[in-house]
Amino acid sequence: MRKCNVLELGCACGGNLIPMAARLPDSYFLGIELSPEQAQEGLSRINELGLANCDIRQADILDLQDEGLRFDYIITHGVYSWSPPEVRERIIELSSRLLSP
């Protein structure tokens, strides 16, 4: 797929998203990270590379609101297995709501 929308929950500093965004400039990549320091580090890398198709937002998964965006892929590498039950339930809820049909 050459054009897609990708959401990563628990993206840290963008180690997955940034290389994909560089490789797929017609796609959109959004990362959500709880740690303000990790999110800021990722944003700094995105800005240094001039990637207009990638963004990282500092937020708690439990507080995410539906902004109308839909995603072809949702990545939860590590986060799902390391999180408490309420976060895992929220990840499933978000995935079912935000995945493109």
PLM segments and residue spans:
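Conserved class I S-adenosyl-L-methionine
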Residues: 2-12
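Conserved SAM/SAH-binding beta-strand->alpha-helix loop
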Residues: 35
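A short acidic, Gly/Pro-enriched loop at the edge of an enzyme's catalytic core
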Residues: 65-74
